[in-house]
Every structure is written in C-alpha cells, then in structure tokens.
Amino acid sequence: MGTITVVINEGPILLIRALHRATTNKKMFRSTVWRRFASTGEIAKAKLDEFLIYHKTDAKLKPFIYRPKNAQILLTKDIRDPKTREPLQPRPPVKPLSKQTLNDFIYSVEPNSTELLDWFKEWTGTSIRKRAIWTYISPIHVQKMLTASFFKIGKYAHMVGLLYGIEHKFLKAQNPSVFDIEHFFNTNIMCALHRNRLKDYKDAEIAQRKLQVAWKKVLNRKNNTGLANILVATLGRQIGFTPELTGLQPVDISLPDIPNSSSGAELKDLLSKYEGIYLIARTLLDIDQHNAQYLELQEFIRQYQNALSESSDPYDTHLKALGLLETPPPQESTEKEEK
C-alpha cells in the first residue's frame, strides 16, 4: 500500500512538473521565435516598455517581481499590485538600456503614425522623481525625434508642442541638457527653413515670434559649433527680416572631424552622432547659396560623405521621405507657443 500510495500521490506531482516544463519550454520557444522574427524597432520598443515598467514599479515590490529566486513566492502567494489589485507576475531582470535602443525605435516608426508621439507622451507622463526615466533622454534623442517627425513620420508640430510643454519637467528632473542649442534649437531652425520653403512662408512677424519662442526654451546655451548663428542669419534672409536674439553671441564655426582611420562600429557611431550636423550643413547650402562662403561646411560634408562610402546619403533620404508623406508638414498655427 505504501508503494501504491507514493505512486498515486506522485502522479499528479510528476504531471504538474511535466506541464510546468512543457509550459516553460513553450514560452521559451515562443520567445526564441519572437526574437528571431521581430524587427529591430519592435525589439527596441519592447526594451523601452520594460524599462519604463520597471522604473514605474513600486520599489518595495521590485524584489518580488524581478528577482528570479522570489518568483515562486509570487506564484504561491496572492501578492497583488496595491494600485491595480492585479496579481503580480514574475518578470525577467531588467538590463541596462543603451541609448541606441531609442534611436532604433525612432527609425522604425512608420509615416503618418502617432506611435512616437504617443510613446513620448507616456514616457514623459511619469513623475519627475523617476530620474532614470527622465535622464535617459539625451540631446541626440531629441534631435532625432524632431528630425524624424518632420521629414519622415509627420506630427512635427505636435512633437514641438509637446517638447515646449514639458521643458520645465526636464529642468526639475535635472536633465536640462536636452534643450540645448546644438541639437534642440538648431534642429528646430533647420526644420523651419525647410518648412518655409515648402509652404512659401514670408511673414516676418510670425517668423520672429517663432524664433523667440524656440530660443526661450533653450536651457543649455553653449554654442559650440557656431551653426546657430548661421541658421538664424539664413532664416532672416529667407523671410526678409533681421533676427534679434538676446544672448546668442557671435561664434566662429567649428565642426568636428571624422578621422579617416575610423572604421567598423566606431565609424557607425560617429555617423549617427554627427548625422544632425550633416543634415544642418546640407540644409544651409541647399537653402541659401550665400552659405557657400563657409568652407567649414563644405569640408565637413566632404568628410561625412567619404565616411558614408556606398551607404545612402541621409540628407537625400530625408528629403525623399518628406516628399512621400501623405500630408504636408503641419501648419504653424498648431504649434504650442509660450511667450
């Protein structure tokens, strides 16, 4: 009887173990298949979502949710989220999130989609006390979001308006660097130059007001490259007015070098890092031939194009994408202005 009892009692136990192994293997199989076929953008979005969930999770609950050794506690005890009252489920440990992850997601968003805008609203809708969320965003991220929104995705005015409205949050979260001259302001003016040409805008009063609003939002006014001065002067010639910006000091143009010795991953990183400067330099020469006097622009363009080798030219690609947008660049009136 003892042997039979053991066999009978172990039967369900062995069955449960087998089912657990099968379920685990099935989940692993699904995960492997998903990783194999998911796009770079989908993988990046999943990592961003997991990072956000982790940092929004109550600190007292993280040890139970994210430590594998505590997973069984969640499975055997009725531990619930104090806010949603939903049963807590174990989650894999969160790995450090690279800056490239957000770049990959930005590049993946389809034209005329609100996906990037919706994601950024959710990300910046968190408490400023969640510093890791706010400090993850870099000036280059802001530049790429603005550039992608204008040339490829659309919803540019909405993205600008969102940024204008949350500037104070980044300041309180101790990440004012995202509102700088080199990435935020210069990209804003670059897009304005293209927008004015496309829409044939010539209203000097509106242009001056828009310029002042953009300048007011700049928290880091280190004018390292001197591109801001050329951009503002080009805007003035394009519209026909004399721009006035208090605090924008004259600076000699100084652009980075792309060494010939760079190759592989290092070269790829440099091309991504300086893509914004390249777009601005090409824009300045494309919009106004007066800027051909700046030999530094031409030299930087030469170096960048040499480094591209046979890769597609990002400026040409961006202009082509802009032409393919189903809707024209947003009207000025939809931008959120703060005086």
Curated annotation (Swiss-Prot):
GO MF: structural constituent of ribosome
Primary localization: mitochondrion
Cellular component, GO annotation: mitochondrial inner membrane; mitochondrial small ribosomal subunit; mitochondrion
Transit peptide: 1-37
tRNA processing recorded as keyword: no
Any Gene Ontology biological process: mitochondrial translation
Keywords of this entry: Mitochondrion, Ribonucleoprotein, Ribosomal protein, Transit peptide
Localization, UniProt: Mitochondrion
Superkingdom in the source lineage: Eukaryota
Extra facts: Present with 16000 molecules/cell in log phase SD medium.
Role summary: Component of the mitochondrial ribosome (mitoribosome), a dedicated translation machinery responsible for the synthesis of mitochondrial genome-encoded proteins, including at least some of the essential transmembrane subunits of the mitochondrial respiratory chain. The mitoribosomes are attached to the mitochondrial inner membrane and translation products are cotranslationally integrated into the membrane.
Quaternary assembly: Component of the mitochondrial small ribosomal subunit (mt-SSU). Mature yeast 74S mitochondrial ribosomes consist of a small (37S) and a large (54S) subunit. The 37S small subunit contains a 15S ribosomal RNA (15S mt-rRNA) and 34 different proteins. The 54S large subunit contains a 21S rRNA (21S mt-rRNA) and 46 different proteins.
Family the entry assigns: Belongs to the mitochondrion-specific ribosomal protein mS27 family.
Name of the protein described by the UniProt record: Small ribosomal subunit protein mS27
